[in-house]
Amino acid sequence: ISKLKNINKNSIISGVSYKEISILERFKKKGFKNKWILNPKKDLKIHDTKHNLETIQKKISSIKNFRRIQNLGKSDVLIVRHILEHCYDIKRFLLNLKKLIKKNGYIVFEVPDCEQSFLKRDYVMMWEEHVFYFTKNSFINLLRASGFKVEYFERYKYSYENILIAIVSLDNNQLSFNKKNKLQKNNFNNKNLEKDKFLIKQKIKKLKEKNFQICLFGTGHSALTFVNILNIQNQLDLIVDDDKNKLKMVLPGTNLKITNSNNLKNLDKIIILLGVNYESEKKIISKIKKINKKVKYFSVYKNSKFNLFKNEKFKKN
């Protein structure tokens, strides 16, 4: 970012939400002292202290004038991290972002990369707070169709879900589409979902025939998405989550109350379906082994080596 044309330590670096606080602090340490971030109360008229991105994006899309920003100075570099996928009115949101930057300014977008999840049918990608699921091609095409020129693009790799980063400038004359790098095959469809439902139920049925109990470990959005989309609520025997705030709550879609991991101690034949954060799987397995060494593991994530679909083939009688 600091190497962009016309950007120097006197440039104004800014952000639209709390998602940019850490990176703005990094800029400050590097000598960029002119910075601002949209204030929820002063700029967006948000008075609910428990607001989140769903409220921020809606307010940004609807505000006509950012009066305080006019006084602070429009941005040379506006950073917009992990909010675009939450937008209800993405056209209006992008139009209003343009009001926050100078004519020769830049916007840095960061969104989740869903391409591999589409190809692998990784259902836990889906989240009730996300309206859009971007691939490289759809992301770039959206920006170009919205009057931006893509100055820089990068796919930043992570262990589970990659990140798409685009630095754009204003270019209202450019409305071109890139037909290259299209998603080769859309595996996310009802036909494949029905196959996957069948595979999972058959696998669980075989495990239950061997007297294994099925325990869902973790009750975050990934676990709930997996359980409900693949319709395996009725095949779960135990729900475990060590978050004290969730204990004795009922898992949505079931009549099962959430309990803690101490209840795994005396179970002989138990299958743990890991629904925790992908990066936390090894840590959780290590923790469970201290409680019960007999436990076997599967994961809700397609990228995990404990993938529940692993080695399963579709064969319906």
Regions found by a protein language model. Give the residues of each.
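Hydrophobic, well-ordered beta-alpha structural blocks that scaffold small-molecule cofactor pockets
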Residues: 1-7, 22, 26, 165-317
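Conserved SAM-binding loop
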Residues: 1-120, 133-148, 224-225, 230, ...
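General small-molecule cofactor/ligand-binding pocket signal
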Residues: 36, 56, 151, 259, ...
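Short, hinge-like loop/turn segments at secondary-structure boundaries
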Residues: 52-58, 125-128, 233-234, 257, ...
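Conserved S-adenosyl-L-methionine
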Residues: 148-158
